Amino acid sequence: MAANGKVVSEMIAWIKSQKLIAPRMKDAPTFYRNLEEALDVRRSTQSLMTRGQSTWKTGDAIDFCSNDLLSLGLTGELRREFLAELARHPDFSLHSGGSRVMGGNYDYIEAVEQEIADFLGAETALMFNSGSNGNIAIYTAIPRPGDAIVYDELVHFSTHTGMAASLATTKVAFRHNDLDAFREAMSSTMDSHPMLQDGSRSILVSVESVYSMDGDVCPLVEMLEIAREICPKGNFAFIADEAHATGVVGPRGVGLVKLLGLENEVAIRLNTCGKALACTGSVVLGNATVRNMLLNYAGSLVNTTAPSFPSVAVIRAAYNLMRTGATQKAQDNIQHLVKYFFESITSSNIWDKATDLGILSIPVAEDYESLDFVTHIVPIWTRQKYNWWLFFHLQLAKIAVVPIDYPQVPKGKSRVRVMIHAGNTEEQVDYLVATLCDFANEMIDIEEGGEKGKIPKAAQEIYALMAAHA
């Protein structure tokens, strides 16, 4: 397998980063040694996260991993619109001067927020410096004492962080996208809380439009029907994280909620800017009451400097492109490429045997022809012990993907995540399919050969590098 020097050097840097450090720190201060012991827990399973630069950024690998979903960063389209926006406001200030409630508010940010709210069918919009900050703000500011939160088990980590600090007295998880489990969670929560039964407190339902690790879509319409049935007094509110729907789902990227016409049914939406929009920040959508609660009770807003003019201008530039339909062709190409990938790999000669043996599996490809739309997130499953081998195989083939392992997903649920972008090509997808099939063929040969302890060539190469740099 011919990997170029940049790919190998990045792998060597990663290997070195996974070496245990604490055992070599016997004479170091206790404070730092204890921290390294915590980091060594990650290193011991090769799961320590580092700042390593992905090889797709240097042009040494195909990008099947980044969040630049509409390829606005790749094409320079966003940069051009951003510079045009700056030119329209040549006297802008670089500094907001404070938090939104402590001298940092200004006309431009309010105007952009209202434009976004109008475009997405909301009464108000409020900007945050990141999606995580927005999520944490929602769950620390909105739930009242006595409220309950019922949440999908796969909601974002930042949602869990916010819930942990919330005033809600009850938090109940339900099995991912399982309507029966959701009904049971809603019923049991309602039955065990008199203040929910009498309508004086509310159940907040936390979901994502598109799930970041599984790539599937929330059954939002059906969940709302169940909530109305379980809560006849109407004391429930849905909170939808649209991080992976913003820009790529619905006409002009309006997201799942607006696509389904549920703007008035979902109380709060979080639309992030760091994925399809190729910038940073997030916007929380809701009515004036929700906005005022956030302005008064969200510490991550009250105590944080407001986004600067350039930060807001690039968000406006992205929404300008969406609103005018300039990103629709990119959206359509994502749909085409994902379906092309599904068709290509499921029709390959090795597919049936590989899936029967558990060597390759793509759950989101099942019945994809019947779906209204597919998502850009394509998790590739293999046997758990093969997950890193699959990653090594793709990495050395100059395909940049992300191995997803614990703690990002539950133990036993590891997978390799492929992200398909508007800027990818059919030829790149063909190469991805061929490389996955090569891996499947090699693993089948190993299993059928019966040679104990034999490992695939890519893993041999990586393990040799590990030994050389031990």
Swiss-Prot record:
Enzyme class label: transferase
The reaction(s) this protein catalyses: aminomalonate + (3R)-hydroxyoctadeca-4,10-dienoyl-[ACP] = 3-oxopresphingofungin + holo-[ACP] + CO2
Residues annotated with N6-(pyridoxal phosphate)lysine modification: K275
Pathway involvement of the protein, from the record: Secondary metabolite biosynthesis
Pfam families in UniProt: Aminotran_1_2 (PF00155)
Positions that bind pyridoxal 5'-phosphate: S212, H244, T272
Keywords: Aminotransferase, Pyridoxal phosphate, Transferase
Cofactor(s), names only, from the UniProt record: pyridoxal 5'-phosphate
Keyword Lipid metabolism: no
Domain of life: Eukaryota
Biotechnology: applications noted: The sphingofungins A, B, C, and D, show a limited antifungal spectrum of activity but are especially effective against Cryptococcus species, fungal pathogens causing opportunistic infections in human.
GO biological process: biotin biosynthetic process
Induction remark: Expression is positively regulated by the sphingofungins biosynthesis cluster-specific transcription factor sphG.
Molecular function via GO: pyridoxal phosphate binding; transaminase activity
EC number: 2.3.1.-
Phenotype when the gene is knocked out: Completely abolishes the production of sphingofungins.
Subunit (UniProt): Homodimer.
PANTHER family: 8-AMINO-7-OXONONANOATE SYNTHASE, CLASS II AMINOTRANSFERASE/8-AMINO-7-OXONONANOATE SYNTHASE
Function, in words: Aminoacyl transferase; part of the gene cluster that mediates the biosynthesis of sphingofungins, bioactive molecules acting as sphingolipid inhibitors via inhibiting serine palmitoyl transferase (SPT). Within the pathway, sphA transfers aminomalonate onto the sphB product 3-hydroxyoctadeca-4,10-dienoyl-ACP to produce 3-keto-presphingofungin. The substrate specificity of sphA using only aminomalonate in Aspergillus fumigatus is responsible for the biosynthesis of sphingofungins B and C but not E and F like in Byssochlamys spectabilis.
Entry's family note: Belongs to the class-II pyridoxal-phosphate-dependent aminotransferase family. BioF subfamily.
Protein name (record): Aminoacyl transferase sphA
Species name: Aspergillus fumigatus (strain CBS 144.89 / FGSC A1163 / CEA10) (Neosartorya fumigata)
Source lineage: Eukaryota, Fungi, Dikarya, Ascomycota, Pezizomycotina
